[in-house]
Amino acid sequence: MANVTVRNLPDEVHRALRVRAAMHGRSTEAEIRDILETTVRPPERVKLGSLLASIAHEAGGLTDAEAEHFNQLRDKTPAEPMSFE
């Protein structure tokens, strides 16, 4: 994991962080980590399958007949594990 050093942090900010950490029942360091994580990470990462499903829905989706056709064309054989020998 990476380490970050914050220099010249005003005393008022450090005090506010300590108070906020105490309110949440964690250390100041854990509070700062939580603030950074919630600020820079999206609340929920969009997964590829969900994104593709929403695009298909916006485009009008598939009829039951089209979905069944794709289901019949799909390769249903189980994947073989890779051999490194």
UniProtKB/Swiss-Prot annotation:
Q: Where are the transmembrane segments?
A: none
Keyword Chaperone listed? The answer is no
**Region annotation Disordered: where it falls in the sequence:** 66-85
Kinase among keywords: no
Similarity comment text for this entry: To P.syringae pv tomato plasmid stability protein StbC.
The record describes the protein's role as: Involved in plasmid stability.
* Descriptive protein name: Putative plasmid stability protein y4jJ
- Origin species: Sinorhizobium fredii (strain NBRC 101917 / NGR234)
Q: What is the lineage of its organism?
A: Bacteria, Pseudomonadati, Pseudomonadota, Alphaproteobacteria, Hyphomicrobiales
